[in-house]
Structures are given as C-alpha cells and as structure tokens.
Amino acid sequence: MKKTIFLAAYVAACGIAFANTDTLTFVRELDEVVVNAPVAQVTNNHVALTNEQLNQSNTGQNLPFLLSATPALVATSDDGLGVGYTYFRIRGTDHTRINMTLNNVPLNDSESQTVFWVNMTDMASSMSSLNIQRGVGTSTNGSASFGASINMQTGNQCWESGVEDKSRYELSFNGGMYNTFREMVNAHIVLPNQWRANARFSKVNSDGFLYRTASDLYSYYGDLGWYGIKTKVIARFFGGSEKTGMGWDGVDYNTAYGIDGADRRYNPAGEYTTTAADGSDSTAYYPNQTDNYAQQHAQLTLIHRLSTRWNLSATAHYTHGAGYYEQYKRKKLSYWGLLGNGQLAIGNGQLAIGEDRKAYGMYRKHLDNHFFGGVVAAKYISEPVDVQLGGAANYYIGDHFGTLNYLEDSLIVPINYEYYRNDAKKTDANIYAKANWRIINRAQEQLSLYADLQYRYVRYERNGMNDEDMTDLPLKVDFHFFNPKAGLTYQNRGHLLSASFAIANREPSRNNYKENVVYDAATGEYIGLPHAERLYDYEVGYTYSHQRFAVGANLYWMDYDNQLVLTGEYNDVGAYKTKNVKDSYRMGAEVTAGVKIADWLRWDGNLVASRNKILNYHQYIDLYDDQDNWNWVGQDSVVGTTTIAFSPTITASSLFTFDVAGFTATVQTNVVSKQYLDNTEDENAMLRAYSTTNLHLQYQLPMQQWCKMDNAPDIRLLCQINNIFNAKYANNGGAEASRFMDGSRCCWYYAQAGINVHAG
C-alpha cells in the first residue's frame, strides 16, 4: 500500500498525461465538419486525440494499449503483449459497458456488447480522431454508455475540412521480441474532380508472451469520397481476420508473479495427459487451441449543407462476422448433450443412459452474424441556439452453434456432430434531440446551457438450446428507455467550469441471460431473469489553460440502480459473469495537468482517485477442505458494503516528452492500485498494485536537407521499450465463488510481459 501511495504521489508531482490544452478548438471544428458525430461538449471529462497522437508509439499493440495514458483507463490483454485479445476498463467499468462508435455507427457487438479489437488490428492507423467522454456523455447510437463513450472517425479529416489537397503514401515496418512484427502500407490519394481515397493494409504477427498465444492478424481499410462544396459522399470498407492461440485460462498466483522461479510464460490452455505403453504419464498440448474470426464492415455516408443554417447527414451500414474457436478439453459427456440420445456409441454398444463420465473431446463453438441499419442527423445552427435532431435503427441476426469433432477412447460420434444451436435477433432504435443555448457569447467569455433527450427501444429475441446447461432457452424481451441529459459550461479567459447531469439505461447482454436464466417449460416462467440497469451520473469540473500550462479537476458521482457487476467468475470463452446488485456507486476525482517546461520539454499527466462500492451486498461462498481434495464442507456468506471488483482506487499516468532537432523521446509511466477479483473484498483474491514505464524513441531523418528537395520522403526511425524496469505483474484475473478452510482461494491471473523491445 505504501508503495502504491508513493508511486501515485510521484506521478502527480512529475506531471500527468493528455492535458486538453490543444484540443478544445479541434472539438468544435470537427462538429461542424461531420454533423452526425456525437462529439462531446467541451468539458473536463473529455479527451480528444489526433491520428498522430494515437499512433506515436504504435508497434502492433491493439487500441486499448495505445490509450493507456488517458485518465482512469486500465488496459488488459490475454497474450501478455497487447497484440491478441485486448480489453480496457474506464473508471472500473468494463469494455462491454462503454459505448463505442466508428463514424457514428455502433461498434459494440449487439449481443455481447463487446468490441473485439483483435478483429481489426491496427485500426488506429486509419483513424483521423478519437474522442473519449468519461461518464454518460451526450446521446449516441448503439449500446448505453455506463462508464464512458468513445467516438472514432476514419479517413483524412483535413480533406473533410478542405485544408489539405496532397496525395500521401506511408510504409511502416517494425519488429521486436516474441517474434512480433507489424507491416503497414497506407495511401491518401487525391483524384480529379474532387474525389479522394484512402487505403490501408496491415499485417501483425506475434508469438505472444504466453506460450501458444500466437497471433496471425490482418486488417484493411478503404474509402472513396466525393468532397463538394455543399455535399460529401463517402463509401467506406474495412475489416480484418484473426487467428490467435488461447490464453484466457489464466495461471495461479505464483506463476503470474514469478514466485519461486515459476515460469511466467506458462499457459495451461490445450494441456492434456497422455499415457505411454509402459504406463507412464506425460503432458502434451493440443496444437490448434485457437480462436478464428473474420469481420467485414461497409458504410455509406452522405453529408449535405441544406442552407447556411441546416446541415444533414445520413449513414447506411452493414457488418458481417463469422468464425469459431476450437478446444481440446476433458469434459463430462453431458456437456455435449450426449447422454441417452442415441448419438454416441462405444465400440459396437450404446453408452448406457445416465453414465456421465469424463472424456477428452475436440469441439468448436461457431458464430455467424449480420448487423445492418442506418443513422441520420440534422443540425440547425443559429445564434444563440443550435439544435440537433437525430436517430438510428439497427437490426442484428446471430447464429450460434457447436460441433463435436472427436472423442477419445473409441467413443464414436458423427462427423461434425452439432450438439447445440441457438439464434438471436435484436432490434435497436433511438431518436434524440439536443440543444445548446449560448447565454453569453463574447470573445473572452461564454456561458452555454445544453439539454439532450433520447428515447431508445430495444427488442431481444433468442431461440434454441442454451450452451451453458444444454436446456432450451426461448426468450423475447422489450425495453423502453428514456435518457435525459443536461449541462452548463462557463469559459472566461482560460477558465472553464462545467457541470452536468445524465441518466442512462442499459439492457442485459446475451451472456447475462444465458448464464443466469433458467426456463421452466412447464410453466413458461423464467428464473433468474436479469434486470435492466440505470445510472444517474453527476459531473462537475474546472480547467485553467495558459499558454505554457494547463490544470484541471473533475468530480463525479455515478449512482447505479441494479448495476450488473462482474463477479470474478468467467465462462468457457473467457467472458466474465455478472449479477445485478440493487444499490452501488462510483465516485471519484480526476486531476489532469500539463506544462511546457521549455521549447524542447513538456510533461502531461493525470491522477484519478475513486471509491467504488456495493451497498448491502450478499454472496454465498462454498467452503472446501483443501485444493487437493475439494471436499465440500459447507457455505459461508459475505454481507455488507464491499468494493466493486476490478475497480482500483488509484490510477495515474505520467508522460514526459523531449523534442530536439528531429529527435523525440517520451517516457510514460502508469500506476494502478490493487484490484479485487470479485466483490467479497478478499485480500486472497486480488490483483497486486503495479507500475510500468515505457520508453519511446523516434528520430526523423532530415531528408529535405539531405536531398535538397521540398517533396523528399519523410523517414522516421523508432524504438519502443515497454516495461523498462521489468515489472512482474498481472492486469487481469478471476476467482471462483469458493474458499478453502485455510482461507485461500481458487484464483487465476493473466501474466504480462516483462521488458520487451520493438523497433522500426
């Protein structure tokens, strides 16, 4: 604890990351260019990043790790490097509850409500901007924002604002430890008659820090647009494919933290035991314990200026994704629904009904989905009131099915035997109205009041077998949500004061249903049906910006009704389980600062202190004798006010930037305090506090000076050293809802790489 406090104090003293001194004007300009972008109000809980800022240290890690210096954000990865499956939490809220849009089109998967960055590796290279609004933020499309909203824009923003009219081409290559390589080619092309195009292809490969977590990834992006004076039409196509080795099983505490010489790269996924002819046992690993998925997106956007006051935008979109993951595991036969159904034979005889023994099997779980719809917005600009009206209607179709391909010990099943299938449909529609009233609008003083009203309708239907327990689970639920928001901002000679209040509602995800609900076919009743959540978000903040420095603070109170919190347990695909808790809250203070010490030196940073609690929490814990025998002894319970799982009380980030004569060096330090793995506040089920420091070096060769030509190529050399102090840490994990008589817990952790170097 003392170490955590010391590190946090050091970061606060040294300076903290991404102060918004240069982004406030950018936010307003972007809103005029792209009418339908849900750009945040200029407030203290907002970060705006350009393409250059996003990709400064991009050596192949996925987007969550490129955002790791932003306030209250904790990035996690399965492979330990941030190349394969990566996620993040903001203010302790996991990625499934953070609204993400790309060109105002929902990016969260309709059922899981997750964004899988591994399907679109290196997407940051095609982004022109990224805005993070912590808290509820303004109305946007797709899933509700319960911790933050992230809006991303692709293409070349300069063309949309009419600033740039030059073709540019980019080729990037870098490689590093654990056989990590990234190749990228990018083109921004000026065509005749106001046509413009962007095209990119990226390839990323890595062995991963953990054994057998290799990633084989590619992604592409292309757009073609006509940029007229009053009208813009842009067609976008992008997507990618991934094959990654599984790393979501986790390891025990000693292995994750390298205690007693344990191999931190150990990965139990695909592990099984073979018996030789002499009766001796040995450990082997299934070579194709992998996740395989491909996703394609298409968007068509029209932006038209109807008059000097009215702007209109509309986007039609379509997304298709398909894939599977393959595992070789020892399971009970009932897991595959094989008892007494006539599908399974041993030799020439049928398996006896009721004989539920274990066997190794190779099986696949498949997903094939389609998502399509449209979004529209109209903006009226006047003095002193701007009004924006908009809405969206989206539809999702998803098919889930599992196939069993092999069983050990001469257990015979038909080829590609399908042991479950279920399908889902989801309708998501919303309409909203926003108004911004500039009460005072002088050169040095502005006072604005905004209001934002949204109605959202959701229908979720599913039919078929629940793969959790092989029972039928038909479901049809409707939700009607009203989400009001209001805020006030005051600016005067560098001072910015803001206050806001918002209500957000969110429907349960597919996992919330299939892991908690039991359907009684006889009565038609549902047992354990999860409730929709509601959030009341209060924010107040202050920022002062000077030519050489900026400092700000934001206070928030997020009051939840029926929040679905992570329990620490996860299912067989590595997704965390959740449960409703009636009363809970998150409160905190976010401090940002930045100073330009000299023309060649600046530092920026943030410090977030928070309190995240569940009131009147009650959870039963199964008691067992020890980890060798697992004999059930009884039950214990946890009652009272507890800390919400995966919610650190302190996060902080420091960023020093040195820039001299084409040479740039940045030193980034992140601090994260301890996190509980479940909601019992048990010190035996906890992630230790950690601190990591990364060093980025870059040199831009003086090609114009050497070649004596203005259009000489731009060549930059870079070196990225992650975790330079070789910290042994884990940034994610989980815990069973059980305890042993000696007080120990059955937990798992995701070990992260020590020092690793990449250059290009």
Task: Give residue spans per PLM region.
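Short acidic/polar hinge/loop motifs at secondary-structure boundaries
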Residues: 106-136
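Short strand-turn segments of transmembrane beta-barrel domains in outer membranes
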Residues: 139, 148-189, 200-211, 424, ...
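Surface-exposed extracellular loop regions of Gram-negative outer-membrane beta-barrel proteins
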Residues: 457-466, 476, 490-539, 550, ...
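Short, acidic, small-residue-rich periplasmic hinge/interaction motif at the N-terminus
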Residues: 20-56, 95
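Transmembrane beta-barrel wall of Gram-negative outer-membrane proteins
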Residues: 175-205, 210-247, 293, 298-309
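Gram-negative outer-membrane beta-barrel transporters
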Residues: 557-559, 577-679
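Extracytoplasmic beta-strand/coil segments of soluble accessory domains associated
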Residues: 64-106, 128
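Conserved C-terminal beta-signal and adjacent last beta-strands/turns
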Residues: 6, 238, 284, 435-436, ...
